[in-house]
Design a protein with these regions (language model features):
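Nucleotide phosphate-binding site architecture
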Residues: 14, 36, 75
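Local sequence-structure signature of Cys/Sec-based thiol-disulfide redox active-site neighborhoods
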Residues: 1-30
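Short amphipathic alpha-helix with an adjacent loop that forms part of the alpha/beta core around
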Residues: 42-49, 76-79
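Non-catalytic, surface beta->alpha helical segment in thiol-disulfide oxidoreductase systems
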Residues: 59-79
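Structural micro-motif
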Residues: 49-58
Length: 79
């Protein structure tokens, strides 16, 4: 089964821009959520996953979703 990546980003975050570009370069299935106008949702994600920076990158494979981390974690995951 194909992997699907989900990115939670903020527009003006340099690492978010780089993560977004990375999924486009890789040509992987992905969904991007821009959270600039959704501070409550961003706060919920940070608290639930105990991960306090953006981007927040997730991968879903075989029906299981896991947090990869941020931009550098995504690049390492692709390698």
């Amino acid at each position: 089964m194909d992997k699907h990546y989900t990115l939670y980003i903020k527009k003006d975050c340099p690492f978010c821009v780089q993560a977004r570009e990375a999924v486009f370069r890789q040509g992987v299935n992905h969904t991007i959520y821009i959270l600039d106008k959704k501070p409550k949702r961003l706060k919920e994600l940070k608290e639930f996953y105990n991960y306090h920076t953006v981007p927040m990158v997730f991968v879903r494979e075989n029906g299981m979703e896991k947090l990869i981390g941020g931009y550098t974690d995504l690049i390492a995951y692709f390698d």
